[in-house]
Amino acid sequence: RFIVFFNDKLYLMKYRRWIVRSCNLRGSLVSWQADQKKNGGDDKMKTALVTDGKYRSSIAAVRALHRAGYRVVVTQTRADVKSAPAVSVSKSCDDFRWIDGVCADADYAEKLLSVLKEYEHPVLFCVGAVTLNTVAARREEFAALANFLIAPKETLDVLNDKESVHQRALELGIPVPREYDGTPESYPVVVKPHCGEKFGLKAADRYAVANNEAEFDVIMEKMQRYDPSPIVQQKITGAGAGVSLLLGRESELLGALCHRRVREYPITGGPSTCCESFYDEKMIDEAYELLKSFHFTGLAMVEFKGDCILEVNPRVWGSFPMTEAAQSPIVAHYAQAAQGGQVTYTAKDYRTGVKMRFFLNDTVAALSYLKAGRVKEGLRGLGDFFTAKEALSAKGDGKVMRAYLKKSLFER
């Protein structure tokens, strides 16, 4: 024992100076890492800032950007939520930043600009429509501090107007539903305002279906509270689908992803609760032709029903998590192109046949189908619990789903 102790003592004495130097170096390394974290990372790791963390679509964007090698910062306006959003506990979220007030505040742009100044020209990824429009209205100011692909405010406004999209599609020879100026000649018809989002309507309230004249009169009276001349269109039968596109600064096509609706809630017509990825070259070509005609830049989803184009969402869309489920590189391509990097469009660069569901919403949808007597659809929905990918889940990042469920079920 004495020999061992003696040898250990000699060993420690011999390497004492080396140990001291190592400890000093370690202390310096810790300080350097802290400085790097404060300044947005080292030279090899660039920063991406994702806004509006309260939206579940932000989770997919954060994970994709982190995987692409970015240090991801998430922002959220404090008064718009009751507690920190689920994305804040994601392993892919390197930093979470509160912004005082709500995103509708007059000084929101200045607050967001102030946050951006703390980083070295980060990639800016806007999730919420209000933030997107805020940046679009002051593109030059934001472009001096961040990299992004966002169309001018005027372009976003035109694309948000369903009638403008309808007329442009007609000019391009792209199929659209028939419209009625007065009382419809036949039913059913769909009644919707020119831009439901502008009036603060939830997705499920942005249109209504009239099966006869009596229903039409009631719906028109309700819709005219928001829009004095709502759009009246023939109701198209067929599967609903979305073609999501990424366009560069010169409106060049950089990425595409198709998905079809499997279920929705309310089941009479509402947001998608389950969808499946697929590929359709014709639909992509038509969607791209439409967006290109507006000289669009950025991310958008063109909504189809059957062969007809219904509308355009010129922003991050509700089923955006499909980009992760189908392993689409569209988010990474957004960041790369925003920084001036070269991105070449590759057709079908994602997995097809991937089903994705939003657990809570889709469970309610499946039960609603059963209650309505549509047993096969209801049972199929319950069966997808075991086969479809959960939109917000990811291996090794389970805290996010648990936080989301807790907020959804218990936070009012």
Q: Where are the predicted features?
A:
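ATP-binding N-terminal substructure of ATP-dependent carboxylate-amine bond-forming enzymes
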Residues: 2-19, 24, 40-149, 405, ...
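Serine residues within intrinsically disordered or low-complexity segments
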Residues: 22, 28-31
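Short, acidic/small-residue loops that bind anionic groups at enzyme active sites
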Residues: 145-159
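Active-site nucleotide/adenylate-binding loops and adjacent lid/helix of ATP-dependent enzymes
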Residues: 156-230, 237, 249-252, 281
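A short beta-strand motif that forms the metal-chelation/ATP-contact edge
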Residues: 190-192, 245, 306-316
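ATP-dependent carboxylate/phosphate-activation module, predominantly the ATP-grasp catalytic core
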Residues: 205, 211-214, 234-240, 244-295, ...
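A short glycine-rich, hydrophobically flanked beta-strand micro-motif that places a catalytic Asp/Glu
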Residues: 297-306
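Peripheral (often C-terminal) accessory segments that flank ATP-dependent C-N-forming ligase machineries
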Residues: 336-412
